[in-house]
């Protein structure tokens, strides 16, 4: 057992735990469980996002632009690695070929779109039928 582990066990001994004021115990326990819960919720959200159709570009805008020019009208999720930095919903109109981009952010178990929190994308889609006009199409190029 390393030096770090023995210090941790020393800190968590029953005697040391009894000497800590209750308010600090509550904060410690709440923070510990809340962080674990948040990580679990993020994993759950990322897993459900992976079940949807995603296009994974080679981290350059040219690849995205080329894909959208060749793609038929529809809605697409564009991401490089399903992270908060780059996750977008793109709607391409079949008539004029124009595209609307909406940046999506992951916050715990929620997706933040234009400042509003959604538990899942189905709620967002049902509340805004004008942006989600076409089925999702998967591109694995």
UniProtKB/Swiss-Prot annotation:
Keywords: Early protein. Induction: Expressed in the early phase of the viral replicative cycle. Plays a role in virus cell tropism, and may be required for efficient virus replication in macrophages. Belongs to the asfivirus MGF 100 family. This is Protein MGF 100-2L. It comes from African swine fever virus (isolate Tick/South Africa/Pretoriuskop Pr4/1996) (ASFV). The lineage of its organism: Viruses, Varidnaviria, Bamfordvirae, Nucleocytoviricota, Pokkesviricetes.
